[in-house]
């Protein structure tokens, strides 16, 4: 099959047979190499995106090689920076790999592409949590929670988190303001 593909690159029957053979034998790096060759043989944007996503999936699922999976997805974004499924997959990988700073920027990129206000608020809130819990950046977390509330003033998780941080830091005026905001959105019984 290799010889057939050397003589006729892109010959689909040989390519499919070789994919099956590599998968059956668990020759994942050979399969990735074949896909890499496919990338040099095409200029079609959608084919490149599809091939790079296949490569990323093999690196992640079969080889447990997050750095190479991440690189494949970053290559997709070089071709199509607005490809939302890839942005989300890359975010998932950044989280699995503990690349928190990279994830913050990617969430901002996803929010810009999303266009859905609830999603934007959710991503901003997740960034605030990452700053607080993973990066231990209290000041950054406070600023991020405040940005969430600027987007959605009645967002209960951000109100609670910001209130908690204000209490821990002894910022009583800010805490009073948070309690008032929470009371305004609380249902009356």
Regions found by a protein language model. Give the residues of each.
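Repeat-based scaffolding regions
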Residues: 1-189
């Amino acid at each position: 099959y290799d010889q057939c593909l050397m003589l006729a690159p892109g010959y689909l029957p040989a390519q499919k047979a070789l994919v099956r053979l590599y998968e059956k034998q668990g020759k994942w790096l050979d399969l990735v190499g074949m896909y890499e060759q496919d990338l040099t043989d095409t200029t079609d944007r959608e084919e490149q995106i599809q091939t790079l996503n296949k490569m990323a999936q093999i690196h992640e699922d079969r080889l447990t090689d997050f750095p190479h999976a991440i690189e494949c997805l970053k290559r997709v974004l070089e071709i199509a920076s607005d490809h939302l499924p890839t942005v989300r997959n890359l975010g998932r990988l950044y989280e699995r790999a503990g690349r928190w700073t990279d994830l913050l920027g990617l969430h901002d990129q996803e929010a810009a592409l999303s266009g859905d206000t609830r999603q934007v608020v959710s991503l901003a809130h997740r960034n605030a949590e990452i700053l607080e819990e993973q990066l231990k950046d209290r000041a950054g977390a406070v600023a991020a929670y405040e940005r969430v509330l600027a987007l959605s003033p009645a967002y209960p998780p951000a109100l609670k988190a910001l209130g908690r941080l204000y209490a821990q830091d002894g910022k009583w005026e800010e805490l009073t303001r948070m309690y008032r905001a929470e009371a305004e959105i609380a249902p009356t019984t």
